[in-house]
Amino acid sequence: MCGIVGYTGSDIAKNILVTGLKRMEYRGYDSSGVALEVGEGAAAHLDVIRRVGKVAGLESELSNIDSDATCGIGHTRWATHGRPSVVNAHPHTSCDGRIAIVHNGIIENFAELREELEGRGHHFKSETDTEVFAHLIEEAYAETHDLMASVREACTHVVGAYGLAAVCADEPGVIAVARKDSPIVVGVGETGSYVASDVIALIDATRDVVAAITLAVGR
């Protein structure tokens, strides 16, 4: 089972994400990664860092990155579709790299969705089922310019179980989450808001948590 964690607030996001991911290593994993919101205005973008193996390897790589990002999402993966590799590790991104997503669950109709999306010009980088979500959200965002509305629209096309969190470089400080037959909790602490697939990931940050359905979490 995959692990999801997210944070938006005033603290350094990478430290919080790594702590949460390490707490969820008991769920099993073959790779891990984070997406961090970096820059402001026209310079805003997402930094995506992924590693195969233990979260400690990701932590080591992040320790060499001077990042003051205060919003991001992270993931530990247990492979279901696609072999363990950096390319198949989460987060997955849209074609333009402005949207990133982490997901726990199985998308039953991913092959059909992938074929349709590729037919509309989307380029897939991984073997995973999760990546279809990134492209579905990207398509919807081109129309809505609203991350949460785009996540809702993407979910209408998916058959299967999912818990997901998404960020967009054009909506700083916002994490959109949705779930169906897969756990996601949202917590509020003194310095920000948190998202996780397991409450144990948030135990150091807050005890004020609720089960999520579909919502946007902001600072």
Q: What spans do the regions from the language model cover?
A:
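Conserved short alpha-helical segments that host acidic/polar catalytic motifs at enzyme active sites
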Residues: 1-216
